[in-house]
Amino acid sequence: MAKIRVYELAKELNISSKELITLLEEEFSVEVKNHMSAIEDEDADLIKELLSGKEKSEKTKEEDDEIETTAKNPIKESINNKKSNKRDDKNEKVNTENAEDMAIITMTSDTITVKEISDKLEKSYAEVIKELMLMGVMASVNQEINFEMAEKLAAKFDTEILKEEQDEEDDLEDILKDSEEEENLQKRSPIITVMGHVDHGKTSLLDAIRKSKVTSTEAGGITQHIGAYTVELNGESITFLDTPGHAAFTAMRARGAQVTDIVILVVAADDGIMPQTKEAISHCKAAEVPLIVAINKIDRPGANIDKVKQELTEYGLVAEDWGGDTVCVPVSAHTKEGIDELLEMILLSSEILELKANPNRKAKGTVVEAKLDKGRGPVATLLVQNGTLTVGDSIVVGSTYGRIRAMFNDKGENIQSAGPSTPVGILGLSEVPEAGDKFYQVKDEKTARGIADKRKEKIRDEYLQSTHKVSLEDLYNQIREGKVKELGLIVKADVQGSVEALKQSLEKLSTEEVKVRVIHGGVGAINETDVTLATASNGIILGFNVRPDNNAIIASERDGVDIKTYRVIYDAIEDIKSAMLGMLEPEFKEVVIGTAEVRQVYKISSVGTIAGAYVQTGKLARNAGARVIRDGIVIFESELASLKRFKDDAKEVAQGYECGLSIEKFNDIKEGDIIECFIMEEIKKKTL
């Protein structure tokens, strides 16, 4: 149903927007926020009819009053009416001309450039700049002016400027609505995530499917970041997401499960279910994603397919040939056996799911990976989930934005557009987005920038509130918990996905005694700014597949900042564990070093009670802990206040010797008491 803006209706009715808003609220009970609000055409027509009827009624009343007055003094009234009519006609003519001449333009943001307002006013740049100079403002063509200044400037050219209270998120609301008409939906390719335990052949299986070798280029044979690939089978395409196989990458796997349609769980036939396999099963169940089990390495001598199926039943996954509904396909990435059957099962499962999308709408999807390329700037791998993305489109990606300058597929070929379920690399973003961010296509780059700026502002406000909002209760707790230590880390990596995964896995190492906090995470080389931040926060810098630049090295040596660089993630986690072990509060155990029997007691007024004792086992040491045991019951615990051998002070007295001793703050020593001497030894920690 068509709508009309309040200011447009006010113009038609020849009244001000303010008067119309008041009228709508008071007489018609129609709530409007401002002059840019829209009302239904039906309501507008009703208002026009009622107002025209009201005007006629008022006009009739005025005419009746006029006739009555004229009848009282016809000659005088006739003269006055002639003068009045002439004056009214003149004013009405001027007002009508002004109303007709007064154009209306709108601006959507708080500021507008001189160029933009010149185009809207349909005036030359020189004319507009001249008027601004007369108003005392020196501005160039590309300089921005605020709304108040724009309003005054527009008035000089007999134009009214209105500020459109536009909510940039409105554009996204239409995209987010998934109420697609059935006739617009078309079949789309399935999106597959491959999960599995480290070294179970997950990447090798993908290599076998894609008929390419990637594993050899990865450190330690482990995939270091997410990639997206498309393969063709019998004229149909399948999109694969490859997630790292280590347990530390829980966040990455979970992110993959959010965009995937089917999960392939790779389990080695000679190894069975392992910790990362259990995690992958949990993710699939939590995300309610269908699962296909690929039992890999069936060519190995120790392969036992039935054992794997048996272990799967413990997690509620019963194979189809065992009477369950879990698809299990024996495969070998080495010999390529079972690969075709696996792909066929994927296509069969996708047919059952009836995967559909509308390619004829604005695109939306998810960021699979993002990095900063020296030559090309921010490069992002996007997975289009709905609509069609085209070169030249403007998109919002989390708190960043851009206009797509170039687009390429997983083979590195330049393409012009990408439909649903297609992974593409793009150039043209203003910044490197976060892996897992959602992207949406909007009408133009200005709208995209507006949405991104608002999101950044919101994130900044939330950060400031959470960082600087300190209450007395918080301060008290920090003082009270003075023993709590914190290990601050700055994480830099080659790709955003690795940063996110490292952050989450490192923060999980936190214990009650040591808190691990990632102060900053970013993409690119370690620079001087990172060192400055580490100095201020007393933190350590971790680099993953990146190196520090020269300025960073000089600054770190000067400030004593520790920079650690790694190529394999296990090493990073192990080093942090070791660092944490040194920060943990030491644990102690009690070690009894000796016992002595009290044989005689001496009462000395100025000193207290002195016990003459015989060392039965071990030794007694001065300042060690001491317990007084009577009839097998500990009656007092303190420490040795003094220890003497004859008249000389002794550091320790060994077994078989007599000595004199006193107990700190205890004088009720009796003959026959046993003095047990002990020390507290620190336990060296081996694991967290």
From Swiss-Prot:
Residues 50-95 are annotated as: Disordered. It is found in: Cytoplasm. Gene3D superfamilies: 1.10.10.2480, P-loop containing nucleotide triphosphate hydrolases, Translation factors, Translation initiation factor IF- 2, domain 3. It comes from the Bacteria. GTP binds at residues 196-203, 242-246, 296-299. GO terms for cellular component: cytosol. Residues 50-62, 86-95 have a biased composition (Basic and acidic residues). Residues 242-245 are annotated as: G3. InterPro entries: EF-G-like_DII (IPR053905), IF2_II (IPR044145), IF2_N (IPR006847), P-loop_NTPase (IPR027417), Small_GTP-bd (IPR005225), T_Tr_GTP-bd_dom (IPR000795), TF_IF2_bacterial-like (IPR000178), TIF_IF2 (IPR015760). Keywords: Cytoplasm, GTP-binding, Initiation factor, Nucleotide-binding, Protein biosynthesis. Residues 196-203 are annotated as: G1. SUPFAM superfamilies: Initiation factor IF2/eIF5b, domain 3, P-loop containing nucleoside triphosphate hydrolases, Translation proteins. Residues 187-354 form the tr-type G domain. It holds the Pfam family EF-G_D2. Its main location: cytoplasm. Residues 72-82 have a biased composition (Low complexity). Residues 221-225 are annotated as: G2. Residues 296-299 are annotated as: G4. One of the essential components for the initiation of protein synthesis. Protects formylmethionyl-tRNA from spontaneous hydrolysis and promotes its binding to the 30S ribosomal subunits. Also involved in the hydrolysis of GTP during the formation of the 70S ribosomal complex. NCBIfam families: IF-2 (TIGR00487), small_GTP (TIGR00231). Belongs to the TRAFAC class translation factor GTPase superfamily. Classic translation factor GTPase family. IF-2 subfamily. This is Translation initiation factor IF-2. It comes from Clostridium botulinum (strain Langeland / NCTC 10281 / Type F). The gene is infB.
